[in-house]
Structures are given as C-alpha cells and as structure tokens.
C-alpha cells in the first residue's frame, strides 16, 4: 500500500496551523535506567552493528463528520511496512479525547507493531506524541503504545512550517527510544541530555532554522538539522524569477533532515532489546 496516497488524504482532514512545535512525548521515569541497561546488554551481545529492521505499521485515520511514507529512516536501516489503514468517524477521538477507548477499539499487532493515529485536532497545541519503549510493558502499556499525530502535519497539511511529515519522523524517534537532542532542563549545558555521544550538548530547543546556533559554546554547534530538535521542517528561500512564464517561483530548502550514526545505533539497539519479537 502506498504511504504517499494515504498521507495525501490525511492532509485534507485538518485546517489547524501550528505556531510552534510542541511534542507531547514524555519518557517514563525508569526509561533512562532501562535504556542504559539495554545499551550495555546489546553491546555485550555484539548487537552494535547496523542490521535492517522492518516495522509492521498500522495507520488509523480519525475524522469528525467531514470528510505515508515514513521514509526518513531508510539510511538508518529501518523500514516501515504499512499493513492496514482504518478510517473512523468519531468527534471525541478526532479532538484527542478518550485515547484509551480509541486504542482499545483500533489498535492492531503486538508490541513490535507501530500504530499511528492521525487526528485533526489535538489538545494543548500538540503536533503529536509517542510512547517510549519499556523493558517490561504491562498490558496497558501495550494497549496505549504507538503515536498520535496531528493530521495537518503530514505532507500537504495546514500546520506550516511543520507540514512535511517530519513530525511523524520526530515522534517515531521517541517510539524507537530517542530523546530530544536538547536538554529538557532548558539552558543546562552541564550534562548530555540525550545519551548519544555524537550529538553536541544543546541547552535550548530550536525554533526556525538558525544556522550556527550554539547554545552551549565549546560543545559544538546545535543540531538544528536533527529530526529530534524542534526546528522548522523547511526554510523558504528567496523567490526565483521565471522569465519564460514571467512569474516568481518559491523555493524551499529542508531544515530537519538527519539522524546521527549514534542515534541510528541507539534505535537499532533499543528495538532489539525492547520491541523485537514482542
């Protein structure tokens, strides 16, 4: 099934514009300890080399009475196989309400299956959220697992400048075990907030696409192009005049466009330790 066709139809569901990126993913209190132990176990087992992963994926499109390809993971050796797409008309779910009831009704697959729920309105101005993996998930953890994404953030949606699908990439990063690249304690340059060695220490989240941003001098410039920052997804370049058609063309340049090798290695190990075969 073509992700691009599905995502284009999802884009038509939302007219919500986003003023700033707001991510609702919150690591559970034991995740730092569990992920550290998982990295150590994977390293001891020799699972640090890159191996191809295919994640069974289910899309659930929620509407309220009106009427994808997740391709940024290819270089990481992680692919997403779209198994099914469901479409549901439910006003409460479309506004982010009754999450448990929605997932109890719609969720498919095991803990290794990614369920993505697209809704036209989310509470608190969120663009989306995913649940971090757990070492020993309860039945409820398995039920609520997955991602809830604002429909307007998919390619062609209305949540500019966050409407190129990078919100889904960002949130799925959390599903795969990645933190934000910036320190959640804003302004703190004393510790590495994301537990990945090749992302420079970053004291603040990014807004826009400010080249050379350096919130922690001496630690390396901020990772403004990283999928796990809060940057805009693209930058509008100066118009280029087309003399043949006598009109100006607007050109865009991607801002959010990369994972580091360290992040890729972490996702691979988190998958093997927390989700594979479950």
Curated annotation (Swiss-Prot):
CDD domains: ZnMc_pappalysin_like. Disulfide bonds join 209-255. It is found in: Secreted. InterPro entries: MetalloPept_cat_dom_sf (IPR024079), Peptidase_M43 (IPR008754). This is Extracellular metalloprotease MCYG_03238. Glycans are attached at residue 52. Zn(2+) binds at residues 170, 174. It is an enzyme of class 3 (hydrolase). Keywords: Disulfide bond, Glycoprotein, Hydrolase, Metal-binding, Metalloprotease, Protease, Secreted, Signal, Virulence, Zinc. The active site is at residue 171.
